[in-house]
Amino acid sequence: MAQGYHSAAMDDIAERAGVSKPVLYQHFPGKLELYLALLDQHCESLLHAVRTALASTTDNKLRVAATMDAYFAYVEDEGGAFRLVFESDLTNEPAVRERVDRVSLQCAEAISDVIAEDTGLSKEESMLLAVGLGGVSQVVARYWLSSGSGIPRDTAVQLLTSLAWRGIAGFPLHGTDQH
């Protein structure tokens, strides 16, 4: 489905998967169900990457960097699978929209939990910041990949981390006056 949902035919999908069309239909009643199964898999991959990044350290600057890098790695390394999540040509399909919205929310909630715990900000305030951090991460990662700018991934992550850290570091750690 690299060319998009509407241009993908079940015959082509079966051929690329190395199975017969009847075998494909044994597992998936139709193209939408196959698409949703792939979407679920890739949404879970993104969520796992974000959660792993957040849990990788207790140093908040390194956490920001790891989380930014998780989005860049996902966009770069998933063989274009990020397009199923972020650039789907089926965003008007309710089942697709629900899954994309859910993974965006789950990623933001994971980020928000860390912000709330570390800063003492309310859940609502932390969530607002988390949606911003997650959104900027995925949009910039997608831009970085599509622009062909030649900026190495680690440099792009470092630049975005610096931008994000200068903002989020302004919220003192819970119970202190320090960053």
Which role does the model predict for each range below?
Residues 2-6, 57, 78:
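Short coil/turn segments at alpha/beta junctions that flank glycine-rich nucleotide-binding fingerprints
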Residues 1-33, 37:
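Helix-turn-helix
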